[in-house]
Amino acid sequence: MASNLTIDERWRVIEAYFKSKGLVRQHLDSYNDFVRNKLQEIIDEQGEIPTEIPGLKVRLGKIRIGKPRVRESDRGEREISPMEARLRNLTYAAPLWLTMIPVENNIEAEPEEVYIGDLPIMLKSAIDPISQYTLDKLIEIGEDPKDPGGYFIVNGSERVIVTQEDLAPNRVLVDTGKTGSNITHTAKIISSTAGYRVPVTIERLKDGTFHVSFPAVPGKIPFVILMRALGILTDRDIVYAVSLDPEVQNELFPSLEQASSIANVDDALDFIGSRVAIGQKRENRIEKAQQIIDKYFLPHLGTSAEDRKKKAYYLAYAISKVIELYLGRREPDDKDHYANKRLRLAGDLFASLFRVAFKAFVKDLTYQLEKSKVRGRKLALKALVRPDIVTERIRHALATGNWVGGRTGVSQLLDRTNWLSMLSHLRRVISSLARGQPNFEARDLHGTQWGRMCPFETPEGPNSGLVKNLALMAQIAVGINERIVEKTLYEMGVVPVEEVIRRVTEGGEDQNEYLKWSKVILNGRLIGYYQDGGELANKIRERRRKGEISDEVNVGHIVTDFINEVHVNCDSGRVRRPLIIVSNGNPLVTIEDIEKLESGAITFDDLVRQGKIEYLDAEEEENAYVALEPNDLTPDHTHLEIWSPAILGITASIIPYPEHNQSPRNTYQSAMAKQALGLYAANYQLRTDTRAHLLHYPQRPLVQTRALDIIGYTNRPAGNNAILAVMSFTGYNMEDSIIMNRSSVERGMYRSTFFRLYSTEEVKYPGGQEDKIVMPEAGVRGYKGKEYYRLLEDNGVVSPEVEVKGGDVLIGKVSPPRFLQEFKELSPEQAKRDTSIVTRHGEMGIVDLVLITETAEGNKLVKVRVRDLRIPTIGDKFASRHGQKGVIGMLIPQVDMPYTVKGVVPDIILNPHALPSRMTLGQIMEGIAGKYAALSGNIVDATPFYKTPIEQLQNEILRYGYLPDATEVVYDGRTGQKIKSRIYFGVVYYQKLHHMVADKLHARARGPVQILTRQPTEGRAREGGLRFGEMERDCLIGFGTAMLLKDRLLDNSDRTMIYVCDQCGYIGWYDKNKNKYVCPIHGDKSNLFPVTVSYAFKLLIQELMSMIISPRLVLEDKVGLSGG
């Protein structure tokens, strides 16, 4: 039975998975959880708004989210579509309505539903109306029907919240201390709860004592004193709370001795309080210590006095882990193990952002209530509420990426270069580690990332290994309430920690018996003991498979010579992956199930509910024995991979034969696939993207992997199938350049269009001033000259289908003066500035679209889209799907190109030197497979591990009359002579990348200079010069060309004339009244002489003067001002 599950049948399971989940499900699930649960929880956390006024408070009720809408400048409201938000630079957001109940002197008033702000909507989420639309309706409102959603629209631009990778919070992670320090072993806990994170550190010093430190208390607190402050008083209770093992208990003697002078709770609290409330009364110190322990010590366990016992047992468990590490019973925790990582998705990040925004809202409302009541007005909540507090806080964070907690780059502009780059951006995972440090271990591929993170897709350079992408079938847990799972575990027979300690200390039971029991750890917290850990883990799995407990729960049983622990996890952010469950060597998913999947009778989720497929996190996978293939199954196996190639991410999945390439080549291709030009969105004609590229004739690859269809690449491809010859022809394809057939290019191969958007709005300024979009008149400041405005219509905007070039004005606009001074001195017309929008320097094109609309504030908004035809030319960059990139070195007409006996002429000629050292065998195999596909008309499957055998394809092309190694006899097109060697000819999919000569071509003679240094500006966008650097300078010094050196570094850079006093050597200044240069020291009593220097040198002298250093210039050959 096991061997019956063929690749095709398992592929049906994969198709079913993506049919029900999609590719950006992780963001949508997380955001949906936020709007359904977390939003109300944040309101309930607050509960009510207290005020300083006796008897007055406001109770908070349910929160409701409206439909996405825009509030127009005339105060009218109407629903909007995402496309309208994009075009009009609006935010796609919905109003939040909160029920408030004012309570005065315990008398509740009528509940009021109050508008408290706008919440940006994630496209295609549960609260987005378009998630329910049919394909036809989506097309009608201007959306790409295949767009996956998962991003926001803020001020008209698409922004994605990038998944953040973090160490798991609320877990005890032990490690050894730094060599040479006083600390031998440490434990770190990041206690994270609603709204804040508190790091707690436990240290074992060389003298055997344990100390705890956390932010609210300066210095380190001895562990035993903290235990007593938390309510566990006697030495015996403390020792048993830490461990039942006498060997571990013995390690606590130094700590108990150290704290022997402090015996009761108040003394312990006073010890802590004396560090925070210095010089205050004992009662105040104790009270302060209690507040700090409740609020800032392990807040995830609770913040009330009742939770102190829980905190004490948690601390004791952490100490026991440190002692076990010291005794050599356990290894230091691996921070890079994916069981110790959590991903923070849009929902979690939004929750933390909304919490801060809501707190600010509550603070403001409290102030407004008190102010209103003091003035004796009637309570009118709707008038007092300021909704812009919530709206602006959230919008600003999304628009800039600056999140609460000091994180930057959390939200990014969605990369729309092509379809793949967009999907990849939505599945990206960023580590919070600083990229400046080496962190080699963190960047390495870890075994637990198998099936969770793509092994190939990571950037080169400083972010390598820190920026990752989800593997195809990685799924992220949303999490369920811990209390439900805890209750279930106790019902299953787990004995609570306190009960076990009571039995041993008071009941007289044998502690050695309990030592054999397993510790049960729920989300990093020791909750009790169970006799047989293996049995408990299996019971939990059985109940999960039966659907009695949530499939979000994962369990791992860790057993070594000394450790026996059952870890149960149900928190959010764990990366999990689905596997087929195996029983007695047989997979539980049968052929009947697969037939039902195909017919649509059941879905992938049904298989999970039936207990045939389950999601494992990295911790539970430690217990799993997973077979890669059904044929490998033995009775010992617990799970079967659904499909091995699913370990790859989205971009690596499109590479044919990736297992035949050297690993870095696949990494390079993963980066380049995101730069290829194709069809980035089906609604490109309606969109106003800042910059966009469109390939005119994208083709589906002839050699495909199975994942292409799922990703949607076959509908939105980015490349062409090119006939490739591998030979050195003319030498114009040396060093990775390629020769391209000019005739193919003339027939339209790799033609693309580049779109650039220019936009401006009529801004209204305070004081009644405003911009005007008109044809500027000759009198305004900064007027460019009549020929620059020649293309504008009467309304000041260019017409569609007009040719433009760099410097031409597209939108005429005048603005009021920047400074009040100008306004007073000049007439209103003269004071106006020309702020017209001009075509970028060095760019050209045809006006494609003109959009005139208005923003939500009622300002006129004009957008002009310019298109430019890009025909492949020398220097444009291309790449195959195997990391083989190259630029066009020469375009040769078809008549001069080599041709085969059958008259086939290549589109691209690649130099053979590009292949041996790079070992991209995948490309050679793709050429053979592509040749077979072109001859037979059948698409070739090149899925990694499950490909059509290459030998089979070689036999096939032999039947069509071609050599199996794909080489052919070739004639030189220029001479007609036969070329001695046989030449490899195949069909390979090549991509045009967005690095084109037209965007980079740059030169300048004269041009703008910087204000400060008066040296030429830098960069193409600023019409900058080409830097003549230090090394170039050294060459000219070595060569001895003094005049050339002066020409480059002085005459054509920042030559300036200064006047120097011959007595004191200071730089003089020009006195307007006397009409001559004077010395700052001697006035007009000394002679000043002109000196030609570099302006940067003059600047240096003056900056030194500002630092009270007095450089003086000594003059040699003096030439007076009159030349005498």
UniProtKB/Swiss-Prot annotation:
InterPro entries noted in UniProt: DNA-dir_RNA_pol_su2, DNA-dir_RNAP_su2_dom, DNA-dir_RNAP_su2_hyb_sf, RNA_pol_bsu_CS, RNA_pol_bsu_protrusion, RNA_pol_Rpb2_2, RNA_pol_Rpb2_2_sf, RNA_pol_Rpb2_3
Domain of life: Archaea
Single annotated GO MF: ribonucleoside binding
Subcellular location: Cytoplasm
Protein name, per record: DNA-directed RNA polymerase subunit Rpo2
EC number, as in UniProt: 2.7.7.6
The protein's required cofactors: Zn(2+)
Cofactor annotation comment: Binds 1 Zn(2+) per subunit.
Function (record text): DNA-dependent RNA polymerase (RNAP) catalyzes the transcription of DNA into RNA using the four ribonucleoside triphosphates as substrates. This subunit is involved in DNA promoter recognition.
Family membership noted in the UniProt record: Belongs to the RNA polymerase beta chain family.
Gene: rpo2
Aminoacyl-tRNA synthetase in keyword set: no
Main subcellular localisation: cytoplasm
GO biological process: DNA-templated transcription
Keywords: Cytoplasm, DNA-binding, DNA-directed RNA polymerase, Metal-binding, Nucleotidyltransferase, Transcription, Transferase, Zinc
Extent of the signal sequence: none
Pfam families associated with the record: RNA_pol_Rpb2_1, RNA_pol_Rpb2_2, RNA_pol_Rpb2_3, RNA_pol_Rpb2_4, RNA_pol_Rpb2_5, RNA_pol_Rpb2_6, RNA_pol_Rpb2_7
The protein's enzyme class: transferase
Catalytic activity: RNA(n) + a ribonucleoside 5'-triphosphate = RNA(n+1) + diphosphate
PANTHER family: DNA-DIRECTED RNA POLYMERASE I SUBUNIT 2
GO cellular component: cytoplasm; DNA-directed RNA polymerase complex
Residues engaged in binding Zn(2+): 1061, 1064, 1079, 1082
NCBIfam families given in the database record: PRK08565.1, PRK09606.1, rpoB_arch
Organism: Saccharolobus solfataricus (strain ATCC 35092 / DSM 1617 / JCM 11322 / P2) (Sulfolobus solfataricus)
